[in-house]
Amino acid sequence: MQEQYIHSEIEAEVQKYWADNKTFEVTEDPAKEKFYCLSMFPYPSGRLHMGHVRNYTIGDVVARFQRLQGKNVLQPIGWDAFGLPAENAAIKNATAPAPWTYENIDYMKNQLKMLGFGYDWSREIATCTPEYYRWEQWFFTKLYEKGLVYKKTSAVNWCPNDQTVLANEQVQDGCCWRCDTPVEQKEIPQWFIKITAYAEELLNDIDNLEGWPEQVKTMQRNWIGRSEGVEMTFKVKDSDDSFDIYTTRPDTVMGVTYVAIAAGHPLAEKAALNNPELAAFVEECKQSGTSEAELATMEKKGVATGLYAIHPLTGEEVPVWAANFVLMNYGTGAVMSVPAHDQRDYEFAKKYGLALKAVIKPADGEVDISEAAYTEKGVLFNSAEFDGLDFDGAFNAIADKLAAEGKGKRQVNFRLRDWGVSRQRYWGAPIPMVTLEDGTVMPTPEDQLPVILPEDVVMDGVQSPIKADKEWAKTQVNGQDALRETDTFDTFMESSWYYARYCSPKANEMLDPAKANYWLPVDQYIGGIEHACMHLLYFRFFHKLLRDAGLVNSNEPAKRLLTQGMVLADAFYYNNEKGARVWVSPLDVTVVEKDDKGRILKAVDTEGHELVYTGMSKMSKSKNNGIDPQVMVEKYGADTVRLFMMFASPPELTLEWQESGVEGAHRFIKRLWKLASEYSAAPATEALDVSALNADQKTLRRELHKTIAKVTDDLGRRQMFNTAVAAVMELMNHLQKAPLASAQDKALMNEALSAVVRLLYPIAPHVCFNLWRELGNSGAIEDAGWPATDESALVEDSKLIVVQVNGKVRAKLTVAADATKEQVEALGLAEDAVRKYTDGVTVRKVIYVPGKLLNIVAN
């Protein structure tokens, strides 16, 4: 065995072995328990970042651990390859998105291999290939046939510069998140999938996601947002028009003093024709964002429409206002306003001089609305026949009366909206719908699938090439001329079912049900919590669609979910001559001074600029504080980077990147190498004889098996990888002090090192693969099996008992492990150090905590 640990040689050699032997390629084996481990696949942006490395290291640790447990482990990888960044890069680099994407895939694939991740590369998929998206198109046509797909005109956030629809989350301060252009509201026809048809099931089944973090489950419950309320109809005075509103507080309906409608509501637009002030307000609202976060923070504004609505219960006339806090695409586009009992309505009413009418008061007192609305539930007053009722009583009585008079009904509403899947971009899967000459809209026939996206295109940065190329849209269906849909799918479509395609990636059908049902559901899914309400909800929805199409037989896609924390790094900048911040990479920084707690006080860059240190923040391009994984792997080795990633923080918390910590991980691997090298110079010649071990050897073996038990639990049930590493490090301290004098010393060291390299193998697989062989074991470590805990080794011959007198420690006793209370009591009372405090006084009570503590109460 070579004396020096040279990571580059070891890692290259081991990676070649894995590739040559197809170590991680798997097939279905009904005789073995399966385990499907999946990390969210990457977007091929060009280079891996440390966030990727953390995500994929966690996945690889889980997969390798489960393999050593004897399971048939599937760990696939692929590329979420469609999306806007490829278009922007293509425009910038005067190329097409496809070659840019495929080059990035090649580069990042080599980076993943360099890190030693145990993927089944035979199952690799890229979502931008027709072999993948043809089945997505096929499935969409089947959903259309089932009535789960429809097209409607919908108000969207429109970026006039990018010529695309933006999600609410992509509108920041009323501007496009990419180009800062003010966003407009625009009505365009779009395709939708009826996720609302599954809202109840998606909500109820959250209770079955036992292996998912509570935070994700709560976020999904809130996003789906089930509420029970009443829908009621308000008629417009002197008109045949009417509109519906929905409320979860029908108990307050007698306090309605005005009604607010969206600026885009048909009634507002109609009234605006003869009202210049209202027309200007409607236009202003079209420019503002529609995210709930923006609605919560923006100034509440409105304009009177001049219309009056008739209260459905009192017959009173209430004014109708157009307001910027009501959305046309949420609920009915109209809300009843009860300023006495809703703070937003209260502030709006105060601003515009509208009436307040209190109708709810505390059960034990009067109501005061002089400073703020009273928003609690209470008892009704000022409410005619409903006076004296509490919330539940009023809810039922008012709902019943509205229903009896044909003016309303009870209703369950969901915050969740149907999924708009149309995107006005080029680099996405074409939506497989056509419009015939006679105006009929229908799915692309199955024999014409896939609808292939042309890859040899020129990006002008203005219009999608498939929208600009009028010839591309022309086709024939059933002998008629037809035009293809030129919108493409939201890229969340591809990531909603990729996990299932991995089960049979080359099948000439969407899924091979036998293979899919062998592997699914995913046993362990790993990815960021930022995906809680979008991807992770669509992922669950798609699984239910696949189930209802007879393609899978489970209800949920993943049993267990781990959401890893972000990776943070130090961030530094200086101000240039124009006063602009220039962010400097931590790799180019020299820390000149720290305080006594290790905090950075002074730092300079390579050019001598004195830097401002802003603390730890998420690695990002904007702050130039990303650390290139490749640089670290070349310097320290993949095993070191992986070990640091797993040791530095619990997986779900943020990880602070510290190169000093990476150096520490590297030193630990070198210590392990040195110990194995010393042992292999004079290895064991005898088998371990447990019955012949002396006290020190028994103690060391007990530490070994305690560590095996802890690491097994930490890597499996608890998923606390950092404490698993800490336990092995502690064991290593014992092993380094252990003698190698006798035959049994060496036999015990052989058992210990053979266990340690398997315990660390999931985390640092290259060095452990190598050491397994150097220790004289035959076969690859992947087939070695996980070390078993010898329960008998954990049994202690003796126990250390702390002896207290009146609560103060006076002695420590070593007693036989099976000593009785009476024996321990007698030994404790006989101790000289104890008798000093008990002689001449009365022992009142003796309390014994078995195996731990003896407390003598004396006075």
From Swiss-Prot:
Q: Which InterPro entries match?
A: aa-tRNA-synth_I_CS, aa-tRNA-synth_Ia, Leu-tRNA-ligase, Leu_tRNA-synth_edit, M/V/L/I-tRNA-synth_anticd-bd, Methionyl/Leucyl_tRNA_Synth, Rossmann-like_a/b/a_fold, tRNAsynth_Ia_anticodon-bd
Record keyword Aminoacyl-tRNA synthetase present: yes
Kindly indicate whether the keyword Signal belongs to this entry.
no
Short motif ('KMSKS' region): ranges: 618-622
Binding-site residues, ATP:
621
- Subcellular location(s) of the protein: Cytoplasm
Return the GO cellular component terms, semicolon-separated: cytosol
Report motif location: 'HIGH' region.
42-52
The molecular function GO annotations come to: aminoacyl-tRNA deacylase activity; ATP binding; leucine-tRNA ligase activity
Keywords from the named record = Aminoacyl-tRNA synthetase, ATP-binding, Cytoplasm, Ligase, Nucleotide-binding, Protein biosynthesis
The protein's enzyme class: ligase
What EC number(s) does the entry state?
6.1.1.4
Report the superkingdom from the record.
Answer: Bacteria
Q: Which PANTHER family match?
A: LEUCINE--TRNA LIGASE, MITOCHONDRIAL, LEUCYL-TRNA SYNTHETASE
The family note in this entry says: Belongs to the class-I aminoacyl-tRNA synthetase family.
Q: What protein name does the entry list? A: Leucine--tRNA ligase
What organism is recorded for this protein?
A: Shewanella amazonensis (strain ATCC BAA-1098 / SB2B)
